[in-house]
């Protein structure tokens, strides 16, 4: 990707973003540790779509810092965006910060450690910087274009890289860890989103060759309760496959930046008409994502070929999901 911002300036923005993520994470940690009073939260769309005062306070901290340091940059945050209720894709060619102040709010309200702050920096629709900080785990995932992806700024991602990054299994999705989320749409209706997801989960988990040939027999199915953390763990190499629909750009911008810089692949969750055709990179605002961990070569394939083979095998087993963006409001 040719970035119009010089590398030296990108490096400065990256250092600022990592420092800001740590400060925001410290505020999250202070709030989650304050368990003397009951957590106060409001429901957005339903009982599993929550927002706390902490979400808004952390976003305010991040937004103020960014607008002070980089007043010419655009800012898109989950909570300020949600209040507008436009649901339009607002990212353009301009340098844009895309922020989720607290991804995994349900986890946060239960003091389950899989929650984080997510800060992405986007230029020409491409995430060039990503920082994810999970304060209860003290895990900082970060990347800058052309600088690699890192855990706690010391260990390069993916973590397993000696003697080389392992290829994906020849029988993938068998022998893989598959991550997915239940999502906010819990309507129990025939062929609804929940039913399609469950069918896809079972297809991936069932013994090989079962379910009309769709059984994938993955090693395990994981649901971390945070799409951002799913992506971070895919970049780390701990998750092999992440499949999801319903996310917004602030959920994935930082994670996609980190995964791509680590050598991963991100494409659309829904299979195209011709699954043997070229695999296109995902559109940031598509709301449908399939991510594959970084992979090295096998004796017969390049790392990219093992990733693309895995993508096609997932597509053969999952249902189409419908998460179109709402129409423009007048």
Swiss-Prot record:
The keyword Transmembrane does not apply. Mg(2+) 1 binds at residues 78, 100, 102. The keyword Metal-binding applies. Signal peptide: none annotated. CDD domains: IMPase (cd01639). PROSITE patterns: IMP_1 (PS00629), IMP_2 (PS00630). One of its GO terms (biological process) is inositol metabolic process. Keywords: Magnesium, Metal-binding, Quinate metabolism. Mg(2+) 2 binds at residues 100, 103, 251. GO terms for molecular function: inositol monophosphate 1-phosphatase activity; metal ion binding. Pfam families: Inositol_P. It comes from the Eukaryota. Substrate binds at residues 78, 102-105, 251. Belongs to the inositol monophosphatase superfamily. Not known. Probably involved in quinate metabolism. PANTHER family: INOSITOL MONOPHOSPHATASE (PTHR20854), PROTEIN QUTG (PTHR20854:SF39). This is Protein qutG. It comes from Emericella nidulans (strain FGSC A4 / ATCC 38163 / CBS 112.46 / NRRL 194 / M139) (Aspergillus nidulans). The gene is qutG.
